[in-house]
């Protein structure tokens, strides 16, 4: 990886519209996949009678999924262009993966929306665009994929562009901030070089559009926030919490605090990829050892931050949520599980403060009795156990969450304000 600026890129869109193939193609065209790996995948795919899957295979690290011909792995794949180092927050389309989309898109700076030319806007296309808008993704590149299946027809392309523009208007996403490109990820059209099949199109190709995305605001200005994924005991070192730096910088010698467990100590060592490093920056996955903090003092879901600017712990918080799939209605007192960063905590909806018109963002109703599928609302939430969470306007990386119940994602949201304990 070069010292270029970093972008986290969400790939969103309906299942089977070709997201994995597009990602594989991007990795392939930017030289991020060794040639021999592609050849090997090609042979495997042909053996199994799925000749066209060599790119999707690049994305596919799960042997069992490979057998079923479905790709669902959210691999943090990386590739570089002339301008940026990209990490792909791959967002597969399967319904249960909306939660990953929520946790993924919240880390994403921009997004590529994949829409199949032969299928147009589908329910998940709508859901993903709505989420992208709710979670604050600023720029959208719309890849109208599978152009080879409609014989590269301009009228088919234009029809899909109109459908997507209507959808963007519905969710108040400024289509001025969207670029539309006719592509075939499978054949490679308009990805890394202009296609001879789309003579009627004179816009940018995908890699050019990616190069021109606006640079993300560097999150290092924010204080250190590092959600803990696991806590290990390693002989000779002691207790080693592991997690990804979301904001700020973790330095050896720092005094840090873990919330909500409320323990603190001095960072003795920081390790990344089995090597000791003096510091860790946003996006780095690290293990570190803190003097005086034992294995039973901290747990997954804690957030590490500076001792003099510790992570917020919410007594209650106000949030804007979007209800995606709930079998009936949500009323005050509803207590599902909130998934925020690495924490999973049951939380009660204490009050439904406002219903929001999702298409305009205006207040549709004050203090409604209930909300249901498709509604956006501002709610006040009380965690049943201590939860560290931050307003998304201050630290967006720790300000979004998914709400799950009955084995599915019910809603997604972002934190507006925290009333601290």
UniProtKB/Swiss-Prot annotation:
Every tr-type G domain range: 4-220
E.C. code: 3.6.5.3
Record key words, sorted: Cytoplasm, Elongation factor, GTP-binding, Hydrolase, Magnesium, Metal-binding, Nucleotide-binding, Protein biosynthesis
CDD domains (alphabetical): EF1_alpha, EF1_alpha_II, EF1_alpha_III
G2 as annotated region, ranges: 69-73
Region G4: start-end pairs: 145-148
Pfam assignment, any one: GTP_EFTU
Annotated GO MF terms: GTP binding; GTPase activity; translation elongation factor activity
Region called G3, residue ranges: 90-93
Protein name in UniProt: Elongation factor 1-alpha
Lineage: Archaea, Methanobacteriati, Methanobacteriota, Stenosarchaea group, Halobacteria
Gene that encodes it: tuf
